[in-house]
């Protein structure tokens, strides 16, 4: 029940009706900013009259505001919320919590050494264990992330999918790394939601990242009883299956072989 100052669902968060803000410890996640652009790439609703649609056009979105700043502790705190919700879903057979299948991080630290953030990187393995894949936007700078470093896309966890940006001709710009960045996705001159009522054309790995997260969600929507039985009985195996389909199903482009895994 929104606004009653009670943790009705027993997940440890009071009145988390709209998501969670880790800085203010409430569900004031904000509207109309960079996050709105990213959310449109994931799941702008189909037939919305705005001439834009997300990769998954009929999906529920969990919004997080990392109000504590970009520190290792605040990042782990933010990721703990979807983890708790997915754990509840797993343990209750879907009666409680939320069926979180992917997170999207259109933020990070350019040039950061992953070895300096061990808890942050290791947390992706924890999320993956419970069935959550995680997507990260690599730097927009023309840097070899394998050499320069990047967070979070420099983390070696299988459950952190590093994504670069590509254009309509499958050319790329910005960060790359054939040991670190899994693949590229559309993120150059893409159209997405903006503000509270409009759309915009924009560029950045920030938009390739949520597009990928939306595709992960779409994969889970495929009506396949055997797959859902696997997801319920072994969430990690379900995530592994989607990850394998995603990484082996990309178009291998000659101009990208030296840029991405």
What is the predicted function of each stretch?
Residues 63, 90-107, 113, 118, ...:
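C-terminal subdomain of the subtilisin-like protease fold in secreted/lumenal serine endopeptidases
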Residues 64-65, 103-108, 135-139, 164-165, ...:
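A cross-family glycoside hydrolase active-site/sugar-binding cleft signature
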Residues 1-62, 66-67, 71-102, 106-109, ...:
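Active-site core segment of subtilase-fold serine proteases
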Residues 35, 39-42, 72, 76-79, ...:
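Extracytoplasmic/secreted envelope proteins and their assembly/folding machinery
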Residues 112, 141-146:
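Active-site environment of divalent metal-dependent phosphoester hydrolases
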Residues 27-36, 70, 137, 141, ...:
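Gly/Ser-rich catalytic serine loop of serine hydrolases
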Residues 132, 150-224:
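Extracellular S/T/G-rich loop segment that most often corresponds to the catalytic His/Ser-adjacent loop
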Residues 125-128, 184:
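Anion (oxyanion) recognition and catalysis
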